[in-house]
Amino acid sequence: MAQVQYAGTGRRKNAVARVRLVPGTGKITVNGREVESYIPHADMRLVINQPFAATQTEGSYDTLVNVNGGGVSGQAGAIRHGIARALLQVDPDFRSALKRAGLLTRDARMVERKKPGLKKARKASQFSKR
């Protein structure tokens, strides 16, 4: 028997998350590990749960996530974006709540590139007038 699944892809900075929602108990698995061991920061786990909180669906779906690229913050944001997109497939009526919370918008901010002649993207060596 085929199991009902809902999929969504989320992106943030250089991280890409492929998310699958399966009706269940609210367990979140990231790259084959429990979310508590994969993302040790409690505030980042709160970020991941924001779409469920916005739609009052905490504990309704098991979440299976494959995420690669980026750091902890970027991966958490990508997972959040993917969960929000997957919840849209569950029920299109969630769109207004997710949109109001700003969870459907792809955060376009990226790291600014380093420029030649500068130490970092904008940091120049100290200027001496005389």
Swiss-Prot record:
Q: Name one GO molecular function term.
A: structural constituent of ribosome
| Regions of compositional bias (Basic residues) in chain numbering | 116-130
In this chain, the stretch annotated as Disordered covers 111-130
Query: Where does the record place a coiled coil?
Result: none
Q: What UniProt keywords are attached to this protein's entry?
A: Ribonucleoprotein, Ribosomal protein
Query: Which InterPro entries does the entry mention?
Result: Ribosomal_Su5_D2-typ_SF (IPR020568), Ribosomal_uS9 (IPR000754), Ribosomal_uS9_bac/plastid (IPR023035), Ribosomal_uS9_CS (IPR020574), Ribsml_uS5_D2-typ_fold_subgr (IPR014721)
Cellular-component GO terms for this entry: cytosolic small ribosomal subunit
Show the Pfam families listed in the entry.
Ribosomal_S9 (PF00380)
> What are the GO BP annotations of this UniProt entry?
translation
What family does the Swiss-Prot or TrEMBL record give for this protein? Answer: Belongs to the universal ribosomal protein uS9 family.
NCBIfam families xrefs = PRK00132.1
Q: What is this protein called?
A: Small ribosomal subunit protein uS9
